Amino acid sequence: VVRVVRIRYAHSEPLFWRAKVEAVEAGNLESARLLAGGAADLGFVPITLAAELGMPIVPRLAIYSVGPIISARLFKGRGEGFCAVSETTVSALALNKLLGLSFRRVEDPWAALEKCGGVLVVGDEALRMVDRGVPHLADVGEVWHERVGTPLFFAVLVARPGAEGLEEAVREMENSVAYFYENPAPVVEAVAKRLGISRRLVEE
């Protein structure tokens, strides 16, 4: 069975819901290391790292947004300056290039709301903040769409050179996404329960 890096966020759920692959969970920055070190054969890697490391991309699946993304937002804090969770590379670079913002790295986004004027949060923690009504200054996908007008790619599918069974693994994930579109309710329910957020937000 092909070992596939699954980025540890809710948006990965449809890709792996019904896929017969060995999922290796990892954070954004860890994913590239697992592939480079041979601990996985295929996986999703932030597009910034894939480009920086010259990793071979499989142009079949990607994690991207067209317009507002909800799970990548600059939330309004009560302090000064701008902070970003350490896991983000793509969103921080996008806001740096488009809005001229630079960020201090933080580990705890909730604590950072007290210290920083704006906190860039991505993934599941961003969804929790939206669910709890934390106001935001900017939605990364929305800013990108308004300023650039193209889809914003967060993560691309990368293969380890020489790995076997990749075509079958990619097909498994494509079929899993197709199952999700046919019947999204079980995935929506599972994600809402796991994150402790409203079903309506997950549906968005």
Q: Which role does the model predict for each range below?
A:
Residues 20-25, 55-62, 82, 100-104, ...:
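Active-site regions of enzymes building and remodeling cell-envelope glycoconjugates
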Residues 45-46, 85, 122, 160:
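Conserved residues at the C-terminal ends of beta-strands
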Residues 57-78, 147-161:
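Hydrophobic/proline-rich hinge and linker segments of small-molecule sensing/allosteric domains
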Residues 27, 46, 89, 139, ...:
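Helix N-cap and loop-to-helix transition residues
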Residues 1-19, 25-26, 65, 69-117, ...:
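Bilobed "Venus flytrap"/periplasmic-binding protein-like clamshell domains
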Residues 33-37, 47-53, 64, 68, ...:
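Short linear motifs at secondary-structure transitions and domain/linker junctions
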Residues 1-54, 58-61, 78, 178-204:
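N-terminal hydrophobic or amphipathic helices and topogenic motifs
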Residues 107-190:
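Pocket-lining segment of extracytoplasmic ligand-binding domains
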